[in-house]
UniProtKB/Swiss-Prot annotation:
One Gene Ontology cellular component annotation held by this UniProt entry: cytosol
InterPro entries according to UniProt: NagB/RpiA_transferase-like, Ribose5P_isomerase_typA_subgr, Ribose5P_isomerase_type_A
Catalyzed reaction equations: aldehydo-D-ribose 5-phosphate = D-ribulose 5-phosphate
The keyword Heme appears for this protein: no
Catalytic residues as annotated in Swiss-Prot or TrEMBL: 119
Protein name per the record: Ribose-5-phosphate isomerase A
Amino acids binding substrate: 40-43, 96-99, 110-113, 137
Single GO term (MF): ribose-5-phosphate isomerase activity
Pfam families reported in the protein's UniProt record: Rib_5-P_isom_A (PF06026)
Family designation: Belongs to the ribose 5-phosphate isomerase family.
Pathway: Carbohydrate degradation; pentose phosphate pathway; D-ribose 5-phosphate from D-ribulose 5-phosphate (non-oxidative stage): step 1/1
Length: 239
């Protein structure tokens, strides 16, 4: 008897297949006895699952450093031993996703899931920071389609909003589904999303972080390599 499709069944998309393709490729880059930064988000979760398979099948000794409660749960389910940032002297490689990737500079916008602060701490601490993306995430310039998220201390949200308004932007407090009120990060802070023109990623990153009350923003100016899933192959972009 044929199974009746339910309304909430997830149907794999072309984007999903491209994400899985780059996740599998990235998992092959991890070597035995490495400490790996585990990013957050749908693509990073696929990488975590593929890495877990390798650990089990090849009996590898690998430790993961999660960047969110979500990545911690996915890694635990995948069988990846976890350690905290203060337990590891070095992180050999960090693998994460992105919301936008600038083709010419490999700068990024991250934080659609509200995890960018802990992601940036881990990603920037790693010896090598690798980003996974499907070809739909590539852009000529950052910020035209995707807002930059700012993690903001709740005490300062109104002053941060006022500062952003004076910069001729249109900031918005991020609200969530399943609860009333603003999205609250794993660290207990709020998210303000703002569309802003980004000509120089490092300059914008530093400028936004200099606003009192902003803990961290979603502009990532540092990235070593991007694995891009296309319909034909996985392309590798390097600086």
């Amino acid at each position: 008897m044929a199974r009746t499709k339910k309304a909430n069944d997830e149907v794999p998309t072309n984007s999903d297949s491209l994400k899985l393709k780059v996740a599998k490729q990235a998992a092959k880059l991890v070597k035995d006895e490495m400490v790996v930064g585990l990013g957050s988000g749908s693509t990073a979760n696929l990488f975590i699952q593929e890495l877990g398979k390798r650990i089990v099948e090849e009996e590898l000794y690998i430790y993961g450093v999660p960047t969110s409660f979500d990545s911690r749960m996915v890694a635990s389910t995948a069988g990846i031993p976890l350690i905290s940032l203060d337990q590891c002297g070095e992180i050999d490689i960090a693998v994460d996703g992105a919301d936008e990737v600038c083709k010419s500079t490999l700068s990024l916008i991250k934080g659609g899931g509200g995890c960018h602060t802990m992601e940036k701490i881990v990603d920037y601490h790693a010896k090598e920071f690798i980003v996974l993306a499907d070809e739909g995430k590539l852009v000529d310039s950052l910020g035209d389609k995707t807002p930059v998220p700012l993690e903001v201390i709740p005490f300062a949200y109104s002053t941060v909003l006022n500062k952003l308004l004076k910069m001729n932007t249109a900031p918005a407090i991020r609200t969530g589904s399943g609860k009333m009120g603003p999205v609250i990060t794993d660290s207990g802070n709020m998210i303000i999303d703002v569309f802003i023109s980004i000509d120089d990623a490092e300059e914008t990153e530093n400028m936004l972080n200099n606003i009192p009350g902003v803990l961290e923003n979603g502009v990532f100016s540092k990235c070593d390599k991007v694995l891009v899933g296309t319909s034909k192959k996985v392309e590798i972009l390097k600086k």
